[in-house]
């Protein structure tokens, strides 16, 4: 058998140098590693990796070229109680694979064994890693580097955003190409968003349970290959990388940043009954958090948890993030279940991965957004992430809904959330932009569903409506469902307007869910993770154009208010904010805690937000001076107001002085 040259221990993965391919694989506990290459007929040839430096195995295959399909068989102990599950009968994906051929099917041969190893060979059905050659002309591409104070994030799904868009060419709808098409770029600019945050684009798999039910994982939070683009949204798997980069380049030219939702907390190997296709067979003990009995700590709810305190796994995570920044020019990341990143196993602000990111000149300068919780003990860590992380602020989400969709909430609590939750984020040198304010996100009700449904309706998910949260803080305004009489529809519209204004005129970084500006509904499904269909795809032909115009006007207004774009904490007497009651007097202590939901917020001494969140029409006395409503609140007849605004129930209006 032909032997490999020793090669080099870096760079990690499979690297083509024009004459052959260097292969590396991290495994601290392996005893032997075989590189397996496959020809066009599926015939397999095996080579031992001859080199080892520390915990990295390596070898060089002369004459190998891009397009070569490969995998690994890793030999070592089968000691489940100690966390070791080596099984050379199972072909394994390279964790650094830039492209993967084949899907992860629900197949018995992909199971590595539970108490005893499954020695049936799986090469015939296992996904294969593919060597690529990477050459791309970025031309004059430059990162927009939008300041946090001016950032407006738009969370979207690659397919769902454009699949039903009638103005896009049919063949590119629902693809990476569509993201950078002039029609979409023009829409983003007209709306005013500055950053497109994409649900996971790294290759993912549908869980076996979903496959057996005839469903698919739509959102993508079941990662299979962290360095490879999901191929389903490309014209061909070979073109995925370039088509994604074309979209990034087009968006950058328009000044729009691209943020990736990334899943550095678990893998699609799931629990011990899940498939063995990569990390479990390469070095289970190193890659995952293992309990004393050899099973997994399941702090993710997905069966396993990556051990991001292990030096080898920290290096893997950082190289993955750098790859997306350096190779694909993305501008930042939103980290799913990000508390896992700080587990040692307890959460620490100086956890190894946080320290590595902060020390990295590439990663420390891009936008980093944490979903600051996981499901393990001590997993809720809102406000506790170290700089330079921003965080999703669920306090804002819940407070905004409770304020406008009648629940008990004090004026003081609302004001605190409006002011970037300074009680949570004003620490460790962090600025207001660290609070990523949201009303809705991919998981949960859409904004329209928040005003149409009191209960979740997740029957289509096949779990008898048990999945999804029951804490929605929603209000159907008297009738469950989308329809209703005119007066009910008007009340729902007013609530949506008030919620959007609260989001887009609050201090902090606003995040808008794609489709909320259209009036998109998921018909009460608040956990549509497995609905790759019209329930989740945005219907552009049915979009509420008036709501889109209203949203765009709010974003333009936001960018005109220095108190919101300055990204500095508001201080007493600094001219940024004054909190007034309905009589234009400073709020009293009793009004902060017990008063009705009536207030005025004066920003930058010239923009006044008048709020009536009560159930009655109420006169609100404006501060001294001349005030005129500003778009989107100004009507055709927009007189100067010098005394009183008659605030409608659940109403909000913004005025400008002079």
UniProtKB/Swiss-Prot annotation:
Residues forming the catalytic site: 336, 371
SMART domains on file: Aamy
Pfam families in UniProt: Alpha-amylase, CBM_48, GlgX_C
EC numbers: 3.2.1.196
Listed pathway(s): Glycan degradation; glycogen degradation
Keyword Hydrolase belongs to the record: yes
GO MF annotation list: glycogen debranching enzyme activity; hydrolase activity, hydrolyzing O-glycosyl compounds
InterPro entries reported in the protein's UniProt record: GlgX_C, GlgX_Isoamylase_N_E_set, Glyco_hydro_13_cat_dom, Glyco_hydro_13_N, Glyco_hydro_b, Glycogen_debranch_bac, Glycogen_debranch_GlgX, Glycoside_hydrolase_SF
Keywords from the UniProt entry: Carbohydrate metabolism, Glycogen metabolism, Glycosidase, Hydrolase
Region called Disordered, residue ranges: 459-484
Reaction(s) the record says it catalyses: Hydrolysis of (1->6)-alpha-D-glucosidic linkages to branches with degrees of polymerization of three or four glucose residues in limit dextrin
Function noted in UniProt: Removes maltotriose and maltotetraose chains that are attached by 1,6-alpha-linkage to the limit dextrin main chain, generating a debranched limit dextrin.
Family, as annotated: Belongs to the glycosyl hydrolase 13 family.
Protein name: Glycogen debranching enzyme
């Amino acid at each position: 058998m032909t032997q490999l040259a020793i090669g080099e221990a870096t760079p990690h993965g499979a690297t083509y140098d024009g004459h052959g391919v260097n292969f590396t694989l991290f495994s601290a506990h392996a005893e032997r590693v075989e590189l397996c290459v496959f020809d066009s007929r599926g015939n397999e040839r095996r080579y031992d990796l001859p080199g080892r430096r520390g915990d990295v195995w390596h070898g060089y295959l002369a004459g190998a070229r891009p397009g070569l399909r490969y995998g690994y068989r890793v030999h070592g102990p089968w000691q489940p109680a100690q966390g070791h599950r080596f099984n050379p009968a199972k072909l394994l994906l390279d964790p650094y694979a830039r492209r993967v051929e084949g899907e992860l099917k629900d197949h018995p041969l992909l199971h590595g064994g539970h108490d005893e190893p499954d020695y049936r060979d799986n090469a015939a059905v296992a996904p294969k890693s593919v060597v690529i050659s990477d050459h791309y002309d970025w031309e004059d591409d430059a990162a927009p580097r939008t300041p946090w104070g001016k950032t407006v994030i738009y969370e979207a799904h690659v397919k769902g955003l454009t699949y039903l868009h009638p103005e896009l060419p049919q063949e590119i709808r629902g693809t990476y190409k569509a993201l950078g098409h002039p029609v979409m770029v023009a829409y983003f600019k007209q709306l005013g968003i500055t950053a497109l945050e994409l649900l996971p684009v790294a290759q993912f798999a549908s869980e076996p349970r979903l496959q057996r039910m005839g469903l698919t994982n739509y959102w993508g939070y079941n990662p299979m290959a962290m360095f490879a683009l999901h191929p389903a949204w490309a014209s061909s798997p070979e073109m995925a990388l370039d088509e994604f980069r074309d979209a990034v380049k087009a968006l950058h030219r328009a000044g729009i940043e691209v943020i990736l939702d990334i899943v550095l907390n678990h893998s699609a190997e799931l629990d011990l009954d899940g498939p063995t296709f990569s990390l479990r067979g390469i070095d289970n003990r190193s890659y995952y958090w293992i309990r004393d009995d050899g099973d997994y700590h399941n702090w993710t709810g997905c069966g396993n948890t990556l051990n991001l305190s292990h030096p080898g796994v920290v290096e893997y995570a950082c190289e993955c993030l750098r790859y997306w920044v350096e190779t694909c020019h993305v501008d930042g990341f939103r980290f799913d279940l990000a508390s896992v990143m700080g587990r040692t196993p307890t959460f620490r602000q100086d956890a190894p991965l946080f320290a590595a990111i902060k020390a990295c000149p590439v990663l420390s300068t891009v936008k980093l957004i944490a979903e600051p919780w996981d499901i393990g003990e001590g997993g809720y860590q809102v406000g506790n992430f170290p700089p330079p992380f921003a965080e999703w602020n669920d306090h804002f989400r819940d407070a905004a809904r409770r304020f406008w969709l009648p629940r008990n909430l004090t004026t003081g609590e609302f004001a605190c959330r409006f002011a970037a939750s300074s009680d949570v984020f004003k620490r460790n040198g962090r600025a207001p932009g660290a609070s990523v304010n949201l009303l809705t996100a991919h998981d949960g009700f859409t904004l329209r569903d928040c005003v149409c449904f009191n209960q979740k309706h997740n029957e289509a998910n096949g779990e008898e409506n048990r999945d999804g949260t029951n804490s929605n803080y929603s209000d159907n305004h008297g009738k469950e469902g989308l329809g209703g009489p005119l007066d009910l529809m008007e009340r729902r519209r007013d609530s949506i307007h008030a919620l959007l204004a609260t989001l887009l005129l609050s201090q902090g970084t606003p995040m808008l869910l794609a489709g909320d500006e259209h009036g998109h509904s998921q018909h009460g499904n608040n956990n549509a993770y497995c609905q790759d269909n019209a329930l989740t795809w945005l219907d552009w032909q049915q979009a509420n154009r008036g709501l889109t115009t209203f949203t765009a006007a709010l974003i333009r207004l936001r960018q005109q208010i220095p108190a919101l774009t300055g990204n500095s904490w508001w201080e007493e007497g600094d001219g940024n904010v004054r909190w007034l009651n309905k009589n234009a007097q400073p709020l009293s202590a009793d009004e902060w805690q017990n008063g009705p939901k009536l207030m005025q917020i004066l920003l930058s001494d010239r923009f006044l937000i008048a709020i009536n969140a009560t159930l009655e029409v109420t006169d609100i006395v404006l501060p001294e001076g001349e005030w005129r409503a500003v778009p989107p609140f100004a009507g055709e007849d927009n007189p100067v107001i010098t005394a009183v605004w008659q605030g409608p129930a659940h109403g909000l209006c913004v005025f400008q002085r002079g």
